[in-house]
């Protein structure tokens, strides 16, 4: 039961941090500087989304620290004892890392509670989110290697995580924008959604290429050329295959959006024809893509608890 609780905490802290980073970044490039910018900023949902992401990641980070404390000490009740928690925080690397995450996320929450909505706020949130996301590389399998190999593996991990944050963090606000556009049925909201989708399409290709490249590097370190057959015979390998299948499905949906559905919406907006059919098609596609992304995060949380094939060498 405790292992499942720790796994759930890992999933939630990953999801919250990825959304905090990626969504803050999306608000900076997705809303742009045009005449609709002021209206986009004044809307309450971007601020609320970031606050929810911070609170979820902060609570999950605390729960993860408590769960690891209970697991290492062998006593569930030690999770609530300050002496046990402080010992884990001061005496272990992952404990210090967890405490730093809690500190950064607490600062992010305080800034959001001040309710100063601006590009400066989003820049700060993206920066703090990037720190939290990158820190996961130091508590994952990237910490297994030392020397130059360790630097390369950890660096690849950091870039992989940040690229995932850019993608996943954009999907949530895009889904919300599409839902708002359908609910309002106004051409202005449809144009806002279309503009954001166009901007994300330009970023998406770079993100996918980065994920593929860093994924290959990470697999080289964790599986190795001599053990690639073990991806079908080990728990880690099978979980990795599931992740790759989910990732492939996300790429198919992303390509459909970029080359078919977004151009259809753009044509509707330009020609002043009905935009609702195109918006509904995009809503369905982006929401499914978001659901797949959540499943990927769950698999990543699981992979962090499993021994990779290279650990058997």
Feature annotation, model-predicted:
Residues 1-313:
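Polytopic transmembrane helical bundles with strong interfacial aromatic enrichment
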């Amino acid at each position: 039961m405790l292992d499942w609780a720790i796994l759930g905490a890992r999933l939630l802290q990953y999801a919250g941090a990825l959304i905090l980073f990626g969504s803050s970044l999306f608000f900076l490039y997705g809303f742009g500087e045009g005449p609709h910018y002021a209206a986009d900023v004044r809307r309450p949902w971007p601020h609320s989304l970031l606050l929810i992401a911070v609170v979820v990641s902060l609570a999950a980070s605390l729960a993860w620290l408590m769960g690891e404390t209970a697991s290492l000490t062998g006593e569930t009740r030690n999770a609530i004892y300050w002496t046990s928690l402080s010992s884990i925080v001061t005496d272990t690397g992952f404990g210090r890392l967890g405490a730093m995450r809690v500190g950064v996320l607490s600062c992010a929450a305080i800034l959001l509670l001040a309710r100063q909505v601006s590009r400066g706020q989003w820049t700060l949130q993206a920066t703090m989110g990037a720190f939290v996301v990158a820190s996961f590389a130091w508590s994952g399998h990237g910490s297994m290697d030392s020397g130059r190999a360790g630097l390369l593996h950890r660096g690849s991990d950091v870039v992989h995580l940040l690229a995932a944050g850019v993608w996943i963090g954009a999907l949530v606000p895009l889904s919300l924008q599409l839902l708002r556009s359908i609910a309002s049925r106004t051409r202005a909201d449809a144009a806002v959604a279309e503009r954001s989708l166009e901007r994300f399409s330009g970023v998406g290709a770079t993100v996918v290429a980065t994920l593929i490249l860093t994924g290959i590097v990470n697999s080289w370190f964790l599986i190795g050329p001599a053990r690639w057959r073990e991806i079908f015979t080990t728990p880690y390998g099978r979980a990795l295959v599931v992740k790759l299948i989910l990732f492939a499905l996300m790429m198919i949906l992303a390509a459909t959006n970029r080359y078919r559905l977004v151009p259809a919406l753009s044509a509707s907006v330009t020609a002043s024809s009905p935009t609702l059919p195109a918006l509904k098609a995009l809503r369905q596609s982006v929401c499914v893509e978001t659901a797949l992304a959540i499943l990927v995060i769950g698999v990543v949380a699981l992979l962090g608890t499993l021994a990779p094939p290279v650990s058997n060498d």
